[in-house]
Amino acid sequence: MDTWLANEQSDDSSDDGEASGDTEMDFLRNLFSKTLGISGEKVLDELTLEGVASYIQSGKCKNIICMVGAGISTSAGIPDFRSPDTGLYANLQKYNLPYPEAIFQIDYFKKHPEPFFALARELYPGQFKPTVCHYFIKLLKDKGLLKRCYSQNIDTLERVAGLEGEDLIEAHGTFYTSHCVSFMCRKEYDLDWMKEKIFSDDIPKCDKCSNLVKPDIVFFGENLPKRFFTSMAMDFPRCDLLIIMGTSLQVQPFAALVGRVSNSCPRLLINLEKAGGADPLLGIISIGGGMDFDSAKAYRREAITFT
């Protein structure tokens, strides 16, 4: 697994010819730095994992946010979604779907729930154990350093590792609870109830109204939990270290979270590939728009790689 650091400011300087041609851009960057209150003071002593560890131990780092995706659970035996040969979407032929994503489409589910619940039997929480990544996040909590963990995962392994509901924002929902799909009912069911139904080959139906019961995972066509948005607005301005692990950062609005920390907040990406690239338009003025690892003009970010 590779590691990239997106830090607050680069010490690199352009040669004289290039610098003279970028006078206007430098002026704009300086203007935005002053306007936005971006400090030129370095946060990390060095752009290495040792530098990050030193910062965490310094006492200055008190509000760490982790953003995690399916990549932190693959070593537990749970497939990710998009890997070409081993990913979930590449291995759904047996369900005779019109297209792979249909298994997580709410309209398709209401008409054809069988494929989803067949898949759920294979991936159901309780069959897998947390990985070192999950326990690292729990360690941050135990040390009083974790502000919140924002997870795209529905496998509940963060909870198994010891995180409480307050520690977690399960952006794409969870198997932990389920609800009747009827807006007139919405009766809630717990994990054990759903597990019994799934492993008895029954399509879960509501005891009260006989409509389908669906785990509280977010399907395509459904809104993200309200708590995702309310917590996001409170948490990210206070974040002083953002750790991103095991996500391609392709799904919005989760992917946009990387741009919500302050411009002085170090961002550490631990991934098999670079992700969360900067938006070209916002990148011109060096604010927001994701992470810029490769641009020669990047004033805020540098990258290092470990294999």
Residue positions per predicted region:
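Conserved catalytic core of sirtuin-type NAD+-dependent deacylases
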Residues: M1-T307
